[in-house]
Amino acid sequence: MNRGIPFRHLLLVLQLALLPAVTQGKKVVLGKKGDTVELTCNASQKKNTQFHWKNSDQIKILGIQGSFLTKGPSKLSDRADSRKSLWDQGCFSMIIKNLKIEDSNTYICEVENEKEEVELLVFGLTANSDTHLLEGQSLTLTLESPPGSSPSVKCRSPGGKNIQGGRTLSVPQLERQDSGTWTCTVSQDQKTVEFKIDIVVLAFQKASSTVYKKEGEQVEFSFPLAFTLEKLTGSGELWWQAERASSSKSWITFDLKNKEVSVKRVTQDPKLQMGKKLPLHLTLPQALPQYAGSGNLTLALDAKTGKLHQEVNLVVMRATQFQENLTCEVWGPTSPKLTLSLKLENKGTTVSKQAKAVWVLNPEAGMWQCLLSDSGQVLLESNIKVVPTWPTPVQPMALIVLGGVAGLLLFTGLGIFFCVRCRHRRRQAERMSQIKRLLSEKKTCQCPHWFQKTCSPI
């Protein structure tokens, strides 16, 4: 019995010695679809020696015969290679190009009667739709993975947005700051592989902008895009809602072709001017109160569903003096937090309100400033000069004028009255003289009827 135990041990040692190679621990390598991976295999001695790479089905992929690289009948024969320059250093790695998901397998390197097993897991991460998406659209990323794997994915946008999940990741509402290179990390068996995905969010650089102008100044509207494309074609329109108007109207329509802009239609009031090159640029000749309001510029790109939008606001300021009233007004969309002020330069006289109009009665002479401010920051300023007025005896002068007019009218009336009276007396005297002359000639009336017609009582 005691002699049998050493014999069994000896038999086990002989069986181990007869094994062609010793298998080392399996390594796990993660690869990316379409990329290149290098599976390492190192000999204990730094010299050129025989080696072979096989898959899990023991099909030869490549190896060395003499000093030449030979390839087997595997499906990787046209994509597998080895670094010949490193053979003398005992490095017999296998390089696989243009990785595919089905390349995921266990690969065996046989060198110096030893075996090294490398498990290759190939993953692919792609966007389900076009990587050029309009602002507000959804982004979906899908992970391709080999059967039997259970990876996790974490992605980070250029704007710092983090999403994570399994084989599908979704971003419901893309924002303009999401445009750029997304970094996604796939984890499996405590190993990681990193993907870079370029996402282009089609949007304007700003969602909204406000232009502040004094009455009569020229207005410039600019709509820069947050992306660049080699070929950019589409059409656009600017709708405007003036503060004083009951409804909005189209101010201008245009076409965009190969980054060149051509105007299709423009209103006559106001008559906008548009630049012919990007960025989109509009000029309003004069800022007037009737133009103050809000506009919405839309841009529809060819082969894309939906439109790009940018809101633009125009605020117009007017400072006027009428009789004894100095007024400062603004028109257009303003925040209730904004402050409107009238301030006399170099003096402490100031009138401020969170309103769209302020005024001063009987203002002092000097340069007045009309200011629109936001938390102390001046957004718009207009100056108006008030000249000094000297007091004049307005009432006595008026009385003198009125008295003169009344006297003239009275004198004229008396003159007319006396002229008429004098004329009447003259006619009466002429008639009396005629009667006396007739009587003196002893001409009397022959009948009462003639007397009544020709004679008048004395």
Curated annotation (Swiss-Prot):
Residue positions the entry lists as glycosylated: 42, 296, 325
Ig-like C2-type domain segment(s): 126-203, 204-317, 318-374
UniProt modified residues of type Phosphoserine: 433, 440, 456
Record PTM: Palmitoylation and association with LCK contribute to the enrichment of CD4 in lipid rafts.
Cytoplasmic side: 419-458
Keywords: Adaptive immunity, Cell membrane, Disulfide bond, Glycoprotein, Immunity, Immunoglobulin domain, Lipoprotein, Membrane, Palmitate, Phosphoprotein, Repeat, Signal, Transmembrane, Transmembrane helix
Secretion signal, residue range per the UniProt entry: 1-25
GO cellular component: cell surface; plasma membrane
GO molecular function: coreceptor activity; MHC class II protein complex binding
Transmembrane segments annotated in the record for this chain: 397-418
S-palmitoyl cysteine lipid attachment residues: 419, 422
Domain of life: Eukaryota
Domain notes from UniProt: The Ig-like V-type domain mediates the interaction with MHCII.
Function: Integral membrane glycoprotein that plays an essential role in the immune response and serves multiple functions in responses against both external and internal offenses. In T-cells, functions primarily as a coreceptor for MHC class II molecule:peptide complex. The antigens presented by class II peptides are derived from extracellular proteins while class I peptides are derived from cytosolic proteins. Interacts simultaneously with the T-cell receptor (TCR) and the MHC class II presented by antigen presenting cells (APCs).
Record-given protein name: T-cell surface glycoprotein CD4
Gene source species: Macaca nemestrina
